[in-house]
Amino acid sequence: MSKPIQMERGVKYRDADKMALIPVKTVVTERQELLRKPEWMKIKLPADSTRIQGIKAAMRKNGLHSVCEEASCPNLSECFNHGTATFMILGAICTRRCPFCDVAHGRPVAPDANEPEKLAQTIADMGLRYVVITSVDRDDLRDGGAQHFADCIAAIRAKNPTIKIETLVPDFRGRMDRALEILTETPPDVFNHNLENVPRVYRQVRPGANYEWSLKLLERFKEAHPHIPTKSGLMVGLGETNAEIVEVMRDLRRHGVTMLTLGQYLQPSRHHLPVQRYVSPAEFDEMKEEAMAMGFTHAACGPFVRSSYHADLQAKGMEVK
């Protein structure tokens, strides 16, 4: 019997090293390896990368992280070129090891107590009017990182009084009561928590997470803050069916969620879960029609949509795909 891997604190485990730590193994078949991206999945890079390099430099200068870079988001060039970014707090090492995600796994260091102030100043320097704050999972913290979220929100608003803040939070596994109590003190303008996919594939796609728990988190926040929109998103192409996606949409509406994002899953590396199918733009349009008919006030559905992709436009109800 092989010895368990001894993880060093502060070390990022990625790709094969990360996947080796997952109890439900990822099996890539020859057919899946041959699945090629269709034409609609091709990305055009901007000719001028000056703004992109400027945002990266600002992040490095202040020791901040963006989920855009850490999760290898396909929209990084477009978003950075438009002067927008999704800030990732609580470090760049996640205590979970989801096989669809490119964020590093490991034993994270203690949260940076100066991060809220550095984040607030960076946002002020960039002149942003709408920001998305997300984080890695921090199962090592007694509140799951909720107090750090609250501190960041308070610091950002102190320096940027008119700004709109969207939080994309983890599930606060085992700590929901405490986390919601803390977030009640400084709630965001939009509360986002992603279900990621349908319950049938959770054991493989989101090991360590629970579908019903995530729905309950969204519902309880909405009950405490009925005036604040709640939002959730799914990746498609991981073995689910369109009928299952529609059922998840119904579950979200039953739990008070009014904003939805649906986007195509893309395999970050050959070590991650393979793409099972590519969903066409026409299918995404049909899903959006279904969502709006169910009563969602906002539904961004398209191949490149991510939960924070043009989040400011999503919040205004403008079409994003």
Curated annotation (Swiss-Prot):
The cofactors named for this UniProt entry are: [4Fe-4S] cluster
An example Gene Ontology molecular-function term:
metal ion binding
Where this protein primarily resides, as one coarse class?
A: cytoplasm
In this chain, [4Fe-4S] cluster 1 is annotated as bound at C68, C73, C79, S308
Cofactor info, note text: Binds 2 [4Fe-4S] clusters per subunit. One cluster is coordinated with 3 cysteines and an exchangeable S-adenosyl-L-methionine.
Which reactions does this protein catalyse?
[[Fe-S] cluster scaffold protein carrying a second [4Fe-4S](2+) cluster] + N(6)-octanoyl-L-lysyl-[protein] + 2 oxidized [2Fe-2S]-[ferredoxin] + 2 S-adenosyl-L-methionine + 4 H(+) = [[Fe-S] cluster scaffold protein] + N(6)-[(R)-dihydrolipoyl]-L-lysyl-[protein] + 4 Fe(3+) + 2 hydrogen sulfide + 2 5'-deoxyadenosine + 2 L-methionine + 2 reduced [2Fe-2S]-[ferredoxin]
Pathway assignment reads: Protein modification; protein lipoylation via endogenous pathway; protein N(6)-(lipoyl)lysine from octanoyl-[acyl-carrier-protein]: step 2/2
Q: Where is the Radical SAM core domain?
A: 80-297
Name its cellular compartments.
Cytoplasm
Task: Look up the EC number in the record and give it.
Answer: 2.8.1.8
Q: Name one GO cellular component term.
A: cytoplasm
Residues that, per the record, bind [4Fe-4S] cluster 2:
C94, C98, C101
Source domain of life: Bacteria
Key words of the record: 4Fe-4S, Cytoplasm, Iron, Iron-sulfur, Metal-binding, S-adenosyl-L-methionine, Transferase
A Pfam family that the UniProt record links to this protein: Radical_SAM
- So what family is this one in? Belongs to the radical SAM superfamily. Lipoyl synthase family.
The protein, known as? Lipoyl synthase
Q: What species is this protein from? A: Serratia proteamaculans (strain 568)
Encoding gene (name)? lipA
